[in-house]
Amino acid sequence: MDETYDLIVIGGGPAGISAARLAAAKGKRTLILEKEGWGGTCTHRGCIPTKALLTCSKSYSDLKKFKRLGIRTGEAAIDFGAVKKHQQQIVRVAALGAEKTLADAGVDIRIGEGEILSASEVRYTDAGGAAQTLKTSHILIAW
């Protein structure tokens, strides 16, 4: 298989995903490398998991207010294990959505690390430690 690309993007967060999709849409052979998971910090440790927790918190708070409105719901309780599971599921769905978006756009995707060797070479190392040198016309660092 030819391992030469028009563009190699290092970083699978929102900026990297957008750049890779745009390049592929313009007919460029594009590869995106991501070390941890598609979607970057926002998806895995920032916006999305935080919003999932806030949604649970708001729902619990709303239940407490219902009593004043004459609505009886019984005693509300928080199951932190279930809340965490909900949060993880939301993150998983978002990451899978990002991966599908890339694949549907025709972007080659790999989980692993990218190391710039020169202006036209990137070393890709997968989770098992196997390394491969890839050639490219352009490199975009999107951390």
Language-model regions, residue ranges each:
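Glycine-rich flavin
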Residues: 2-5, 21-28, 33-143
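Short alpha-helical segment within the catalytic ATP-binding CA
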Residues: 18
